[in-house]
Amino acid sequence: MSGKLVLVTGVTGFIGAHVAEQLLQAGYRVRGTVRSMEKADELIRLNPGLKDKIEFVIVKDVSASNAFDGVLKDVELICHIASPFFVENVTDNKSQLLDPAVKGTLGILEAAQGVKSIKRIVITSSFAAVGNFQIDPHNNKVYTEKDWNPITYEEALTTDNGIVAYCASKKLAEEAAREYVKEKKPSYDICTINPPYVYGPPIHPMKNMDSLNTSNQIFWKLIDGSKEATPFYYYYVDVRDVAAAHVFALENAKLSNGRMLVSKGVFTTGDICKVLRKEFPNKSDVIAEPVDITVDPSFFKLDNSFSKSLGFKYHSDEECYVDTAKKLWERAEEFK
């Protein structure tokens, strides 16, 4: 156990909470940024095993200048996860998505520049920074870590598509981080983790089921009793694997200034319903009817072979679907 101190930004978020939990299991010490101590208290209430194990510090806005003043003392490694995720009701791409994502990422890099103890910053990016979301996805394209979303800043400013703007924010933030390291040559290096849709058990504070992360909202609609099984398929990864990738990347020499696409494969809403109806026959009244969905052979490919070549392993589809459903039903009971 190394006992190195890791700063986790956004520690009370969907991914951040899992990252903190896995860091502690791996023997690291964790300092987590929160917007309020109420959020920190709620995280501990939901996960009593984390009690007295995380040092919480308040950072109200990670994109504010000097947001990390006094937060980085003795830190050796950083997992920078906090970032906006608004897709609906975006009225100003620049102020709601682009600026916060870029400033939040550059802010942590700039703050870390003067802290010689920091050796690596692992940044939560996204497949959104990799793929081209302005073309038909049925294009036979194979995406790897070498690919970049081709959208420009100017296009991102003017698009009225919230999803395209969000994807642009992830691309621009990652691009800015890599440019910064290239130009400033800090004492640390960086690595990005690039997941597609992220499913998995939510262990973080939530206001209600409507505040689920965007991916899990799709999953919840399949099992919330509304029986809404909209035929849909896409690439996904378990949140526990996203968290494991952050921990994996912190001290892996092969990921110095690298990039790691993490994806289990393609899910279909029909497959999710089939697995869950088999596993939970007593829940058939709330699980949507499975719809047979064929994935078009021309649908783009997300190549995860680099992560596998490093020895990284993924949860099975069944583990992800079953564990996610159990936790979602459990959390729904909280809000009744």
From Swiss-Prot:
Entry's localization field: Cytoplasm; Nucleus
Binding residues for NADP(+): K39, Y166
One Pfam family of this chain: Epimerase
Alphabetical list of InterPro entries matching this protein: Epimerase_deHydtase, NAD(P)-bd_dom_sf, NAD(P)_dehydrat-like
Keyword presence, Cell membrane: no
Cellular component annotations (GO), alphabetically ordered: cytosol; nucleus
Keywords: Cytoplasm, Nucleus, Oxidoreductase
A GO molecular function held by the record: oxidoreductase activity, acting on the CH-OH group of donors, NAD or NADP as acceptor
EC number(s) stated in the UniProt entry for this protein: 1.1.1.-
GO biological process, one term: cellular detoxification of methylglyoxal
Family the UniProt entry places it in: Belongs to the NAD(P)-dependent epimerase/dehydratase family. Dihydroflavonol-4-reductase subfamily.
Protein name listed in UniProt: Putative uncharacterized oxidoreductase C513.07
Species this chain originates from: Schizosaccharomyces pombe (strain 972 / ATCC 24843)
